[in-house]
Every structure is written in structure tokens, then in C-alpha cells.
């Protein structure tokens, strides 16, 4: 979410959105709302909304969403509302709509000041080893804080079915692969087979983000050791926290080996903590053992390969606002091959 391009589509319907925002905010200046697509999002579409009243952010599914379970607006809204006031910072929900406004579910949230770090570090931000360690530690600590929250204490006791979570996750992503694959990729099929044959016992039950990474967080521009917000909760659930850790480590360590448009390589710059160091920090703060971590890391590779294939399908269907993500076919195969080395 680092740059914006003009929205020339009808995906945001300012003529309908403006009056709705005016009603919920009681500020008629939102009648003059304008929308810009924030590029870099790989699943749901994110728009910056501007008016004389200020700025907000809108989230909606891509046009012609192919895998509806991966674009659940209600899920994002519910978990963000529940986490408000906890140690995990999230934007406040301003408006939630089931489809009457745009023809698809969407929501509007507050715009949080700070930095989304994607392909490079902004000048003067985390340019020394101490700040880089602080940024990495902040990410690990926030993930541990999320996993420490009792779901029932914030109204999320029924947010998912923890029993059998890991097995269902493998099955779910295998099904999504079969639904979106357009060419055979033997490495993906073999990785799915190995994972299904060696599913570990769940380590614990926690609220999981599902796609936790540096560029799904907003970093405080004045203090890189503090996160201002965690974004993009569409894959959140109640399940095994090691699936979150495995995904976080995948993103943290895979930048140079993965399509540059999909994974930031910033954490691989000198001075940032290693994945092993951050995993140890997470384990220390959660009190959970790092059992079968290679399985969870392999699963993260499988999941990302399927996510990448889904992005490719949406790009081919012209459903991603014209964004270019490079050679996604190679990215799918390369990610699966790297996962096989762990499985």
C-alpha cells in the first residue's frame, strides 16, 4: 500500500458512497468524496477516500471475485471491531455494508498515520541496526500479543472451529489450488500431498491473522519500533498460532527468492533480525514450543503458492485494478519447490 493511482472504474461509486459516509459521520463534506486505488494489495482492493472532511480507507473484494471465501468483508469488520482497545492496534470501522452500496460487501475504516514498508525503506527510517532490530522485534511482539488474547474475552469465542484447524487449512488451500490452477505445477501437488500426510498436532488455540507480514502493518514513522496498526484481516480465524508464525517467517525470509512484486525483501537487508531470532522471541513471549516448525514453514510456502495462483487468476480476469505483479507462473512453481525442501 505504497502508492495510489486514480480510480477510473465504478468500483467505489462515490455518488452512493458520499451520502452514506455523510450519514454515518454526520458531516456533509463527505458528499464530495473521491477515491484512489492504493496499489500493492494482492487480494481485496483498498482505496484511499478523500474529501474536505479528511481521509478514510475503503476495502472491497476485487471485481468478479473468484474465491469468495478469501474476500470475506464481514470477517475483517468483526475481528477489527473486537480487537479495538487491545494490545493489537487496528483501524476503527466507520461503515460496514453488506452489498447495498457497491453491489458487494465493503467497509470503510479510519486512515492510520504511519508507513507501509513494501519494496524499500523510506529515507531516514530504520537506517541503523538498532532501529532494524526494534522493527523486527515489534512485529514478533505484536504477533505474540495477538496469540495471547483470549478469544472469548473480546467476543470471538465462535469466530471459528479450532478442532481440526490445521487439517482443514491444508484441505481448504488444496481445494483453492484446484479451483484456480490453469497449468499443471507438479511441485504444488507434491507439496500438498506431503503436508496432508504429516499434519502435526495443534500447538494451541489462538486468534490467527492468516497473512501476517511487514507490509500488512503500519509502522510509526517517528518510532520504527512501534506498530501503529495491523491491516488485512480477511484470513483471520481461531486456530493454531504456529500457522501464523510460519507465514510470518516465510514473508520475512523469502524476499530474494520470490517475485519482487509480491514479497518485500526489506527484512533481508543487513541489520534486521533473522527469522530464527524472531521465532525465538515469539516463543519466549507466548510460552509455546517451536514444535514441527519446518512443517508450518512448508505449509506457508504451499499457502503462498496458492495465493499467488489466485492473484494470477484475478489479474487475468482484469479484476485487480490494472496492477502488474510480474511473472506469477514462475513464482508459483518456485515457491512450491522451496516448500518441498522443508516438507
Which residue stretches match the model-derived regions?
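Juxta-kinase regulatory segment immediately upstream of eukaryotic protein kinase catalytic domains
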Residues: 2-29
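ATP-binding pocket architecture of kinase catalytic cores
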Residues: 34-207, 222-225
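All-alpha amphipathic helical-bundle segments outside canonical DNA-binding/catalytic cores
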Residues: 160-161, 288-300
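Catalytic-loop of the protein kinase fold
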Residues: 207-209, 214
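Hydrophobic residue at the +6 position relative to the catalytic HRD Asp in the kinase catalytic loop
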Residues: 217-219
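Activation of the activation-loop gatekeeper triad in protein kinase-fold domains
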Residues: 231-236
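Active-site activation/catalytic loop segments of kinase-like enzymes and analogous catalytic loops
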Residues: 243-286, 300-318
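Helical subdomain adjoining the active site within ATP-dependent kinase catalytic cores
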Residues: 288-292, 306-343
Amino acid at each position: 500500500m505504497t502508492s495510489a493511482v486514480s480510480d477510473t472504474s465504478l468500483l467505489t461509486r462515490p455518488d452512493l458512497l458520499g451520502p452514506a459516509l455523510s450519514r454515518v459521520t454526520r458531516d456533509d463534506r463527505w458528499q464530495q468524496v473521491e477515491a484512489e486505488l492504493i496499489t500493492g494489495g494482492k487480494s481485496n482492493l483498498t482505496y484511499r477516500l478523500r474529501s474536505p472532511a479528511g481521509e478514510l480507507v475503503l476495502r472491497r473484494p476485487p471485481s468478479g471475485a473468484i474465491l469468495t471465501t478469501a474476500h470475506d468483508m464481514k470477517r475483517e469488520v468483526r475481528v477489527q471491531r473486537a480487537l479495538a482497545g487491545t494490545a493489537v492496534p487496528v483501524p476503527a470501522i466507520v461503515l460496514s455494508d453488506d452489498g447495498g452500496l457497491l453491489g458487494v460487501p465493503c467497509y470503510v475504516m479510519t486512515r492510520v498515520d504511519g508507513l507501509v514498508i513494501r519494496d524499500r525503506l523510506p529515507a531516514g527510517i530504520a537506517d541503523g541496526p538498532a532501529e532494524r532490530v526494534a522493527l523486527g522485534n515489534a512485529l514478533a511482539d505484536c504477533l505474540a500479543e495477538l496469540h495471547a488474547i483470549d478469544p472469548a474475552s473480546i467476543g470471538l469465542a465462535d469466530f471459528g472451529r479450532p478442532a481440526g484447524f490445521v487439517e482443514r487449512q491444508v484441505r481448504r488451500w488444496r481445494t483453492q489450488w484446484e479451483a484456480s490452477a490453469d497449468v499443471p505445477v507438479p511441485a504444488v501437488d507434491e507439496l500438498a500431498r506431503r503436508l496432508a500426510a504429516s499434519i502435526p498436532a495443534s500447538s494451541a488455540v489462538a486468534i490467527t491473522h492468516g497473512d501476517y507480514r511487514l507490509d500488512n502493518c503500519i509502522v510509526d514513522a517517528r518510532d520504527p519500533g512501534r506498530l501503529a496498526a495491523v491491516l488485512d484481516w480477511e484470513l483471520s480465524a481461531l486456530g493454531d498460532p504456529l500457522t501464523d508464525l510460519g507465514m510470518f517467517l516465510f514473508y520475512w525470509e523469502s524476499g530474494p527468492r520470490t517475485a519482487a512484486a509480491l514479497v518485500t525483501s526489506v527484512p533481508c537487508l543487513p541489520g534486521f533480525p533473522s527469522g530464527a531470532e524472531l521465532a525465538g522471541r515469539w516463543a519466549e513471549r507466548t510460552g509455546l514450543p517451536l514444535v514441527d516448525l519446518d512443517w508450518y514453514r512448508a505449509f506457508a510456502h504451499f499457502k503462498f503458492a496458492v495465493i499467488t495462483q489466485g492473484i494470477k487468476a484475478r489479474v487475468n480476469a482484469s479484476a485487480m485494478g490494472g496492477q502488474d505483479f510480474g511473472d506469477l507462473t514462475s513464482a508459483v512453481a518456485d515457491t512450491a519447490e522451496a516448500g518441498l525442501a522443508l516438507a
